[in-house]
Amino acid sequence: MDSAERPLRIPPEMVIYAEKHDIFHLIQTLVRNLMVDKPDDPIQYLINFLERDNVDVPRIILLGPPASGKKTVAKKLCEHTQAIHITFCDILKDDSDLTRAAQSYYDKKQNVPKDLWIQLIQQRLSKPDCVQRGWVLEAIPKTQDEALCLQEAGITPDHVVMLEAPDVVLIERSSGKRIDPVTGDVYHVTFMWPESEEVAQRLETPRTLMPVQVMSQKLQKYHTEAHALKRTYHNCLKIINADQPHVDVFSQVLNFICTPRHSPSPYTPRILLFGPPGAGRNLQAKLIAQKYGIINICCGELLKAVSADESHMGELIKPYLESEQQVPSSIVLRVLTERLSRMDCTARGWVLHGFPRDVEEAELLHKSNFTPNRVFFLEITDDIAIERLALRAVDPVTGEWYHSVYKPPPGPEVQARLRFNPQHSEAQLLMRLKEYWSQTVRLQAFYPQAVYINADQDPHTVFESLESRLVGQLPKVLSNQQTNEN
């Protein structure tokens, strides 16, 4: 056959490698930085860029009205992510021609010109600490004009957090604000008093503490710009209610910044569905396949289909199926490898259930380069599983399934001809459940990023839970170093 006419085969390891190393996002980042920075020597620029310790660093903007807790959240955020905390006041402390020029405007109580303002931001963000570790901009920008200036300069955040609270709460917070002169940490006489008595004794009332009238004016000015800022950053913005304990506020902020933004990178679903008998794997796999056009592969049905086609592999499988014995893992893997290597699975993705049954089979699947990017465990109790299956029966005339509790037969005539599956007897189910649970703990350890779904719900509710974790990217996991330091 002419090589040009051969069917296209994309090795599965190519796709897995690209996803594992986030190649598509890397290329996008390289092109974006090239277009923004416009270096004279693009090749050397790319080499230097790729030699950095961390290409994908945090880029976060934290906005909110006065007294909303921006400083506290920003400092905690930087402790967790190792990013650099930046305020405009900190930028002005740098000794440079630009900062001295900006300070002269402040001394005259004049606004800093936009060109000078953006140069100051660019100068700070281009320093090695920000380049290597990322940054958190607190209260920058303050207006839509400033936000647009940042965009024109190529300063685009991955996440924007806007804190909100009622004005009454903010005014009360402002009046009770206290500062630790040693660390600069912000406390409050009512809402956030330090646990350490030593810290409490040295707290000071801020020299910039605003009277109620001035605070009200600042809030009004903030609100006039807030709506425009929301529109500017709508695609990466999260609004968080700041009128709650600061621990809860920070938890929500951290959860948001650990959630990657939607990526335009190609995404081919490779899904494993685990669950005990009666959990609804077949139904959920069917729903996923129907909605997203991916290939539904039930291992048991696939083996039956191969055994019926009178091929050499079918002749190997048939004796095991006829004697109701488990087909050896090596044979199952050969069948699955052939099926998962076809173009429809490579191009559209797949949802597999019924395999692997244990960690040894999971390792074989992994070594064959068919690594899933989503793993779900459907969870129900043994009592629910037995109730769902032991009370099911099929009408041999119509093929319709009935359940004595949830879907009783329409009349005595249908009731009389119903047939129960011998494998759904309580004794058989208990044996299958025992076998499933004996392997589950090790399988869960083998797939630490697996998602657990409560399957004791309406099937469409279960599907919505699956879907929410299927279409979105999985949250980032902080490194051990970052976790230990906090």
Curated annotation (Swiss-Prot):
Q: Gene3D superfamilies of this UniProt entry? A: cAMP-dependent protein kinase regulatory subunit, dimerization-anchoring domain (1.20.890.10), P-loop containing nucleotide triphosphate hydrolases (3.40.50.300)
List the GO molecular function terms. Answer: (d)CMP kinase activity; adenylate kinase activity; ATP binding; nucleoside diphosphate kinase activity
Keyword Iron-sulfur, does the record have it? Answer: no
Q: Where does ATP 1 bind?
A: A67, S68, G69, K70, K71, T72
Which species is listed as the source? Danio rerio
Family the UniProt entry places it in: Belongs to the adenylate kinase family.
Which protein, by its recorded name, is this?
A: Adenylate kinase 8
> What is the purpose of this protein?
Nucleoside monophosphate (NMP) kinase that catalyzes the reversible transfer of the terminal phosphate group between nucleoside triphosphates and monophosphates. Has highest activity toward AMP, and weaker activity toward dAMP, CMP and dCMP. Also displays broad nucleoside diphosphate kinase activity.
Alphabetized UniProt keyword annotations: ATP-binding, Cytoplasm, Kinase, Nucleotide-binding, Transferase
